[in-house]
């Protein structure tokens, strides 16, 4: 029963969960802590579920040292729901209904496009020819009248990650941290809003955690749906509508696992070791493996690369994926919009998992070098 799974899951999200968490879920699935029912069938207004959601919130607060003047809420709709919720809640902070967006990849581009429905959106830098770097912040053209400045901390499709918090001159800073949430410590006080879908680093699909500063509540546009309104959800302790109870429970278990394994700082150390292992193989492959991202902006979470040359050799990449599958390594195919290969190294992916991939990459390189 306790034998580790032989399959290695490099999925970009939903992603691997810690094995011990899966065993805990399995153990409690039919009868949660002796109450006689599963969390799957538990009333969201019961005292048992109140303990679950309070525990999950407290762990978020503890692991990120969330200041007291921030609310932590659990919503549905994923990151895409927040692409709408952010402007609906915040674009009315200033009369001009405008916002600044930093667009460094597919997800921030999507967020900016969605926000255009609700106001004027200023992309703070010239459009990038390719998503392979973060434009130098000294070149950003921030609008002093913007209600907020938005960026995505880690772009899962293109493998671009911020290793700094942008200085936005006192403006309200909003961050999509879906794919590097709790992979490293973060100074929450520098942000107005942080949101993250759980299904990458902190749980299973279905719940999105939103951390919002108290003074930003109450400015939603009149047309904002109540389920997306931060003030309504915070005022109802995330119970305005039936929340994704099971996903919140799973998230609590994963947060407990992160805490027991040294917290965000320990996750950061592991992320550096794991990502460095793969980037070193890519960089020492004499151009056989190619990562298009500028070294200083490379993601520790998602490593996209091509095989054979910078544009990718389709036959080689197919062979790589087929062989990886034979070795029980799953979900290494790049996002459909960019192709190639992508290894996602979220918190639950172990150093041993990464070493298996590294050994395979070295062997594949040896087999195909001229």
Curated annotation (Swiss-Prot):
Pfam families linked to this entry: Aminotran_5 (PF00266)
Pathway: Amino-acid biosynthesis; L-serine biosynthesis; L-serine from 3-phospho-D-glycerate: step 2/3
Residues at which pyridoxal 5'-phosphate binds: 79-80, 107, 156, 176, 199, 241-242
Cofactor: record remark: Binds 2 pyridoxal phosphate molecules per dimer, each cofactor is bound at the monomer-monomer interface and forms contacts with residues from both chains.
Residues involved in O-phospho-L-serine binding: 44-45, 335-336, 342
Keyword Lipid biosynthesis: no
Modified residues annotated as Phosphoserine in this record: 331
Effect of residue 99 to V: In NLS2; does not affect secondary structure; does not affect dimerization; increased thermal stability
Keywords attached to this entry: Acetylation, Amino-acid biosynthesis, Aminotransferase, Disease variant, Phosphoprotein, Pyridoxal phosphate, Serine biosynthesis, Transferase
One GO BP annotation of this record: L-serine biosynthetic process
Disease affiliated with this protein: Phosphoserine aminotransferase deficiency: Characterized biochemically by low plasma and cerebrospinal fluid concentrations of serine and glycine and clinically by intractable seizures, acquired microcephaly, hypertonia, and psychomotor retardation.
Task performed by this protein: Involved in L-serine biosynthesis via the phosphorylated pathway, a three-step pathway converting the glycolytic intermediate 3-phospho-D-glycerate into L-serine. Catalyzes the second step, that is the pyridoxal 5'-phosphate-dependent transamination of 3-phosphohydroxypyruvate and L-glutamate to O-phosphoserine (OPS) and alpha-ketoglutarate.
Subunit structure and binding partners: Homodimer.
The protein's name: Phosphoserine aminotransferase
């Amino acid at each position: 029963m306790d034998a580790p799974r032989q399959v290695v899951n490099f999925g970009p999200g939903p992603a691997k969960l810690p094995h011990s968490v899966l065993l805990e879920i399995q153990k409690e699935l039919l009868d949660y802590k002796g109450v006689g029912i599963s969390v799957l069938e538990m009333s969201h207004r019961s005292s048992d579920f109140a303990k679950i959601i309070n525990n999950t919130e407290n762990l978020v607060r503890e692991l990120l040292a969330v200041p007291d003047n921030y609310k932590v809420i659990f919503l549905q709709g994923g990151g895409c729901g927040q692409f709408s919720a952010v402007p609906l809640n915040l674009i009315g902070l200033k009369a001009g209904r405008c916002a600044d967006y930093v667009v460094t990849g597919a997800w921030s581009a999507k967020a900016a496009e969605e926000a255009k429905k609700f106001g004027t959106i200023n992309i703070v830098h010239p459009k990038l020819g390719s998503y392979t770097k973060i434009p130098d912040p000294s070149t950003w053209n921030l609008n002093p009248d913007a209600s907020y400045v938005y960026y995505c901390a880690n772009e899962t499709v293109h493998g671009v990650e911020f290793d700094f918090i942008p200085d936005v001159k006192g403006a309200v800073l909003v961050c999509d941290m879906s794919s590097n949430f709790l992979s490293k410590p973060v100074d929450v006080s520098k942000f107005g809003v942080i949101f993250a879908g759980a299904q990458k680093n902190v749980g299973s699909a279905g719940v999105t955690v939103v951390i919002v500063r108290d003074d930003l509540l109450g400015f939603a546009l009149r047309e904002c749906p109540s389920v997306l309104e931060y003030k309504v959800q915070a005022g109802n302790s995330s119970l305005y509508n039936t929340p994704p109870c099971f996903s919140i429970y799973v998230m609590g278990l994963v947060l407990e696992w992160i805490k027991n394994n040294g917290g965000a700082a320990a996750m950061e150390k592991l992320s550096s070791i794991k990502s460095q292992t793969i980037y070193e193989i890519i960089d020492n492959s004499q151009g056989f493996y190619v990562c298009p991202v500028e070294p200083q902006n490379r993601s520790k979470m998602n490593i996209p690369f091509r095989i054979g040359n910078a544009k990718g050799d389709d036959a080689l990449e197919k062979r790589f994926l087929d062989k990886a599958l034979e070795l029980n390594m799953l979900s290494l195919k790049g996002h459909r919009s960019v192709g190639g290969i992508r290894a996602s190294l979220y918190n639950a992916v172990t150093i041993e998992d990464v070493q298996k991939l590294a050994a395979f990459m070295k062997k594949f390189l040896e087999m195909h070098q001229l």
